[in-house]
Amino acid sequence: MRPLLIAPGRFISQLCCRRKPPASPQSKICLTMARPSSNMADFRKCFANAKHIAIISGAGVSAESGVPTFRGAGGYWRKWQAQDLATPQAFARNPSQVWEFYHYRREVMRSKEPNPGHLAIAQCEARLRDQGRRVVVITQNIDELHRKAGTKNLLEIHGTLFKTRCTSCGTVAENYRSPICPALAGKGAPEPETQDARIPVDKLPRCEEAGCGGLLRPHVVWFGENLDPAILEEVDRELALCDLCLVVGTSSVVYPAAMFAPQVASRGVPVAEFNMETTPATDRFRFHFPGPCGKTLPEALAPHETERTS
């Protein structure tokens, strides 16, 4: 059996945010390349020849749909940044506050729709599937907009806002209720002057499995928690097989996902970054296309003149 590229035993699997990659014995293989190209015609040649395309997406794709990113200036909920609340320690200390934060995010998403970037990816996947080619989306986003756009081959490595996990019995279940429990109705306002609701724990979302009734938590990966090893193995298989990789709307500072594309690039596979600005990983990639993904991706993923037509 071949060794995994990103298996937990060889690389970090814990969710964390860093400006520089973690030290590892393999880091020396990710050599800095020549300045990446922004030549769309050259990228389109790679796209036309690719049989297995991996697309790694981050918050920048959904930002164009109006989804808060909780990054940079103005990236606060009340006086907190996401990294202050998206931790197991924060949930243990104040589950009411954390549930208010996620209730706000769930409610925001009800009015958001996929943008042209999401749709370009989904349409490309469907079109290439009919040609016997594969597109897989590996997303760090928890908003389900790729799913809503129609993407089928989807790995949501950080989970989703619309699933819960019981802290007692471990049951994972879809949950699209609005509000998720009566006590959260009208709660979660993001303004800094808003006071915490201080909802009693027994009024927060509870497990409905027979005989359980345990406290529910969002089924997302929090900072300091490990990603699901089974999902990491799926990611590894896809990245080991891909012959073209796109990195779209991601800052390349949240690990372990920030390692994925540089590892693909280290074996000579073309990697194209689509982002508003450069990232710590940009110089490792063959292509970089600045600008909104909703503008660059439709052109990049449009049918190529060499594609079969029905």
From Swiss-Prot:
It comes from Mus musculus (Mouse). Residues 37-307 form the Deacetylase sirtuin-type domain. Binds 1 zinc ion per subunit. The active site is at H158 (proton acceptor). Residues 1-36 form a transit peptide. Zn(2+) binds at C166, C169, C207, C212. Disruption phenotype: Mice are born at an abnormal Mendelian ratio with the number of live-born pups reduced by 40%. Surviving mice display a global protein hypersuccinylation and hyperglutarylation in both liver and skeletal muscle, while global lysine acetylation is not significantly impacted. Mice display elevated levels of blood ammonia during fasting, but otherwise are metabolically similar to wild-type. No overt phenotype observed in mice on chow or high fat diet, suggesting that Sirt5 may be dispensable for basal homeostasis under these conditions. Signal peptide: none annotated. GO terms for cellular component: cytosol; mitochondrial inner membrane; mitochondrial intermembrane space; mitochondrial matrix; mitochondrion; nucleus. Detected in brain, liver, heart, kidney, lung, thymus, spleen, skeletal muscle, intestine, pancreas and testis (at protein level). Its cofactor is Zn(2+). CDD domains: SIRT5_Af1_CobB. Pfam families: SIR2 (PF02146). This is NAD-dependent protein deacylase sirtuin-5, mitochondrial. It comes from the Eukaryota. Belongs to the sirtuin family. Class III subfamily. Gene3D superfamilies: SIR2/SIRT2 'Small Domain, TPP-binding domain. InterPro entries: DHS-like_NAD/FAD-binding_dom (IPR029035), NAD-dep_sirtuin_deacylases (IPR050134), Sirtuin (IPR003000), Sirtuin_cat_small_dom_sf (IPR026591), Sirtuin_class_III (IPR027546), Ssirtuin_cat_dom (IPR026590).
